[in-house]
Amino acid sequence: MDWDNIFSYNTAKIVTIKDRRLGGLHIIFMVLIIVYIVIYSTIYKKGYLLTETPVGSIRASLLAPNEFKDDSNFKYCDDNLIEYNFTKLECDYYDEAFVSFPVGDDVSFAVTTRVKTLDQVLNCSSKNPKCKYTTVSTRNVYVSDIEDFTILIDHTMFAPSSLIQYNSKQLKGYILDNDNNEIQINETINTVGIPGKPDILTIGKLLQLANIDLDGASSVNSTNSVRYDGVVALVFITYSNTFSYNTNNFKYVYSIQKVEDTEYGVPEAVILDNVSSRMYYNRHGIRLIFIQNGEIGSFNFQALLLTFVSGLGLLAISTVLVDQLAIRFLPERKTYSSHKFQITHGFSESRNKLRISQNEKDPLLLVETTKNNENNNNNDDYNDDDNEIFDDNNNGYQNIQNNNIIL
């Protein structure tokens, strides 16, 4: 059993092949990889930045117009003579305290467009499990002039890793129009993205940018209007400082997306004098759900190093590809393969000779060395034959001591 053969070790060998095809291809690969690492990954994709998704908070509030328009101007009101494709109802005027329900939090905001009011009494004891409220009267009305109510949106973003924090008044902002263009609004009432000013939009302007028509057909019931059933819309606020190469430039962008096949309704029970008398409100309207996202980047050496290391792996792949082309596909593949791969003879005999030489230097081990030499002489002829066979089989290969070969 030849242990040297079983536990053989493969090591890299440098061979210079003077072939313009292989050399040119390898240079092209190198140039492309360097361009990919430096130009694309590092500069264009900003591989030197550590990016994170910011978190934040949102405060939204509603304000009624200073002067309401007459309800005769609205075709959804029953005292308007203009034809309306959906159900007409009475129209009532309410202030922001009544229209904004439930009270907004940092993730959603609701605006009432229709409210059904039930005057209910309890004519029995509430301790009786079969006792139910009885409806005395019912009114179903639209909220007049809801499009002229204004909503103020104040939001703050925070990047936990880089500790970057800004309020919306400190940043430039934009809102996407119906053509997905980023626009700023600086009008008498409507303002969006102007540094130093709060973001204020009328409900009508907000719905217009979201492509939502309150007097269009509801996606839940086509016989009802959106004003009647209500609607849910997602308001995305996307923060970024990676849109340019100056990470000190920040911006945010509003985008509003209607949620299809949904309506919005919320009940409210208001106790009057006592529990036996209450007003029950069934509200329908517009629900806005705010979602803060985006990408905030800051310089990070580890991110830059990772970009370079991941790109350098491509260099090794390019070398493997050129090697495989040389030893498997080119007409000279056998010649190239013979120079690339070299098998050495076993080194057991060399180690034995070295051990004998060291033992001969020690007089105390001379007798044992002589015995070992006699035993080894019995195998000399066999080893010589082995070496001759090895030399024949490796015709075309270089000696292992020639580590650098130039063709």
Curated annotation (Swiss-Prot):
One of its GO terms (molecular function) is intracellularly ATP-gated calcium channel activity. Residues 44-300 are lumenal. Residues 371-394 are annotated as: Disordered. Residues 1-22, 322-407 are cytoplasmic. The chain crosses the membrane at residues 23-43, 301-321. One of its GO terms (cellular component) is contractile vacuolar membrane. Residues 381-391 have a biased composition (Acidic residues). Pfam families: P2X_receptor (PF00864). Disruption phenotype: Null cells are still capable of osmoregulation and do not show any noticeable differences in their sensitivity to hypotonic conditions. Quintuple p2xA/p2xB/p2xC/p2xD/p2xE null cells display slight delay in their osmoregulatory response, but are still capable of regulating their cell volume in water. Extracellular purinergic response to ATP persists in the quintuple null cells and p2xD single null strains with no alteration in the kinetics of the response, but the magnitude of the response is lower. Residues 283-296 are annotated as: Pore-forming motif. One of its GO terms (biological process) is regulation of calcium-mediated signaling. It is found in: Contractile vacuole membrane. Keywords: Ion channel, Ion transport, Ligand-gated ion channel, Membrane, Receptor, Transmembrane, Transmembrane helix, Transport, Vacuole. PANTHER family: P2X PURINOCEPTOR, P2X RECEPTOR A-RELATED. P2X receptors are ligand-gated ion channels that play a role in intracellular calcium signaling. ATP does not evoke inward currents in p2xD. Not essential for osmoregulation. Belongs to the P2X receptor family. This is P2X receptor D. It comes from Dictyostelium discoideum.
